[in-house]
Amino acid sequence: MAQCSDLPEMAKAYEAAEVEKKWYQYWMEKSYFKPNPNSDKKPFVIIMPPPNVTGELHLGHALTATLEDIMIRWHRMQGEPTLWLPGVDHAGIAAQVVVERELAKQGKTRQQLGRELFLEKMWEWVNPCREKIRHQHMRLGASCDWDRETFTLDAGPVKAVREIFTNLYEKGLIYKGERIINWCPRCGTAVSDLEVDHKDLAGHIWHLRYPLEDGSGFVTVATTRPETMQGDTAVAIHPDDTRYAGMVGKNVVLPIMNRRIPVIADEAVDMAFGTGAVKVTPAHDPNDFEMGLRHNLPMITIQNRDTTMNENAGPCSGMTAKACREYVVSEMKSLGLLLRIEDYIHSVGHCQRCSAVIEPMVSKQWFVKMEPLAKPALEAVNSGRIQILPERFNKVYQNWMENIRDWCISRQLWWGHRIPVWYCPCGEMIVAKVDPTVCPKCGGTELEQDPDVLDTWFSSGLWPHSTLGWPDQTEDLKRFYPGTVMETAYDIIFFWVARMIVMGMEDMNEVPFRTVYLHGLIRDDKGEKMSKTKGNVIDPLKVIDQYGTDALRFAVTFGTSPGNDSKLGQTKLEAARNFANKLWNASRFVIMNLGEAKELTPEAELPLEDRWIISRMNRVTADVTRLMEEFQFGEAQRVLQDFIWGEFCDWYIELAKVRLRDEASVSPRPVLVRVLSSILRLLHPYMPFITEELWSYLRPYLPESLRETDIIVAPYPAADKTCFDEQAESVMGSLVEIVRSLRNLRAEHNVEISRYIQANIYAGDMASVLGNYLGAVETLSRARPVNILPGHYSGASTATEVVLVLTGIEVVVPMSTMVDLEVEAKRVKAEISELEIQIERLSTRLSDEQFLAKAPQAVVDKERIKLEGYIEKVSRLKSA
């Protein structure tokens, strides 16, 4: 990297692509992304939520990466050793489905290839994807420690997974049993709740009559799935439902199967649904399964894994589910037991990966007993050892933990962490951390490993400590566990955040992180969810190519707050790009006007605007620091942008220009450097590339303590309250208000840019102070002459003058200096005439009975509002 004094003259326009490549490579070479080993401060640690290896990063990833990088850069600038550990998730079913689709294009299946060859194909596909994701994160400016990058199928995580599986099994917390799971018939595996998309579909409710065994009548049940009737093992009613008084304890005869089943009472029954009586099929409905456990009901599975009906379905054996439904409905009708059919909209689960309808099914799988593990994880949050932001998600977390169910961790896939269980022909089952070679029971060597793999979330739950070397007691684990912040989207609090807390408490007896920061979703500029089908998806890499990384980062975080969704469209992206350009142009102006490279010392007695901008800079620094500490990054960004653009650029630099042209005045250069230095450092976490580039040009003018420091590790500004100057802020506030009001007045009356207006400013006690800035007022508002007078003006606006009433100040502007009064009078007369025509037209229309009867109320209301506006405007024009 060239010496600062050797840097070429600044380009007129900011060239993002060139700058980004240069600085990222430089930061890597300088090892700035690694935690400082010499610091004795407490480390700040974020373990990156590992994106799925399946594809390119989307805007959600861009938001995650930007928010985390903001935190990392901010803490790095405070001298803390920072570790941002990156990684990628193997993505289980999501990745396997992609590769299987590629094989299908070649007319092949994984079964034809065999497990070993298929896994080779998986690795061939995965490795380039990992590199691509890494490169994309680099383009986002992510200052991760890439030497610590981890993949969930690396040797370390594999060792950790086997360790925790074995430990939990030995404690009796992992077991193999039959429970209800989500079964995808197309993917051929159990899937997690997260991998099920629920869609509202048009269906029916069938009202079916089940005869009482004693012949005294019928119980009519309402169901949306008559095809599962053969698996019914009870009819349930609510205990408080008086319609079925005396029914509990009786039996009904299950039609078609002629099997006796009991009538039971359970509070889970919704009395308002259908008839208030429901069929209970424990093997094919999650709620029925729980009810079956409560009442010790038999669980009869009537479907095969391909969703065809099995031998337990009686006459429907071998049928598809659809054919079975048609058979049952037809048979019930012929038996006189079909009472009626109603249309109904209900939620149906679909596989997120292949869109097949999910079948709830009792299946033999591996499960984790969650209740004993959930207790310490719940206490960790309730006691405040872990803070969840925003706080409203504490209740969500608590509710989920208190009602937690056993977790199905086995998947009928080939890609993933294979379950560390082996079976011997002698019947022995071996659970081991390392591959066994001999059966401990019979000494046999023909051991076969369980074919299933673990749920992706199982290995992800170990992420905060497996990435640091656990189960080995590494130096990284000692130094960086627990992490500081876990930043992720609010929609995976159950599936990932909760499980990380569970696993951390179990493995480490310590929380995995101190704070959980949950961000919202990014929606389009209309507030709609982005999707490929809607065509409203924004590709972050294309945005970077068009606007630059800093603009993307600034846009995705602007207006964000913990847990709330935000909008993003071209308008916001262009605004972010414009802000970057504004920053570049303002900084370039400052740097180009600093003269010879040297440390600039401000005068002992500073002019008002210098004291004002220094005071404002320190207040903004205090506000931004507080907001950053509170994780209000979007609000901190807004405060910062308002100050940079609305105060430093629009006002201070404009005032400084006047002094730069006057060699006799106090030089604004030292203050320009001081403020710009703070601005760049405050902004660096949000816009790292442009700030580092501008800093490189500013460095020759900085104090010696900063001159040899890159901004990425420069000290973050600290607010100096002794610089707060309320008087300067008050006076400058009045000056800004005067100029802004005169500018607005010019705009309202379309005053030509070349034309000067006149103004008398009645400033009371502030007249003498403001009088020192007469030239600035005239220049900035294009008003001349301007008279600043003591006292106050009590008159009101007339046809010949406009009176602007400001805070303790009145500004009087003669109309003749803004417009030609004769021409203006003709224009007003013509406008009144046109408005009166419109008033007559609307009055006639709103008196028309037919119009009022036929037109929508919204249209009528709109016309009335329009009429009232025209009448008010005519009144205003006539009184002017």
UniProtKB/Swiss-Prot annotation:
Any one GO molecular-function label of the UniProt entry: valine-tRNA ligase activity
Subunit structure: Monomer.
Swiss-Prot/TrEMBL domain comment: ValRS has two distinct active sites: one for aminoacylation and one for editing. The misactivated threonine is translocated from the active site to the editing site.
UniProt xrefs under InterPro entries: aa-tRNA-synth_I_CS, aa-tRNA-synth_Ia, Anticodon_Ia_Val, M/V/L/I-tRNA-synth_anticd-bd, Rossmann-like_a/b/a_fold, tRNA-bd_arm, tRNAsynth_Ia_anticodon-bd, Val-tRNA_synth_C_sf
Organism this protein belongs to: Dehalococcoides mccartyi (strain CBDB1)
HAMAP family, alphabetized: Val_tRNA_synth_type1
Family indicated by similarity: Belongs to the class-I aminoacyl-tRNA synthetase family. ValS type 1 subfamily.
GO cellular component terms attached to this protein's record: cytosol
GO annotation terms (biological process): valyl-tRNA aminoacylation
Short sequence motif named 'HIGH' region, residue ranges: 51-61
Coiled coil region boundaries: 815-854
'KMSKS' region, short sequence motif: residues: 529-533
Places the protein is found: Cytoplasm
GN (gene name): valS
EC id: 6.1.1.9
Origin: domain of life: Bacteria
Alphabetical UniProt keywords: Aminoacyl-tRNA synthetase, ATP-binding, Coiled coil, Cytoplasm, Ligase, Nucleotide-binding, Protein biosynthesis
Function: Catalyzes the attachment of valine to tRNA(Val). As ValRS can inadvertently accommodate and process structurally similar amino acids such as threonine, to avoid such errors, it has a 'posttransfer' editing activity that hydrolyzes mischarged Thr-tRNA(Val) in a tRNA-dependent manner.
Keyword Membrane included in the entry's annotation: no
SUPFAM superfamilies xref list: Anticodon-binding domain of a subclass of class I aminoacyl-tRNA synthetases (SSF47323), Nucleotidylyl transferase (SSF52374), tRNA-binding arm (SSF46589), ValRS/IleRS/LeuRS editing domain (SSF50677)
Protein name (Swiss-Prot/TrEMBL): Valine--tRNA ligase
Catalytic activity: tRNA(Val) + L-valine + ATP = L-valyl-tRNA(Val) + AMP + diphosphate
Record: residues binding ATP: K532
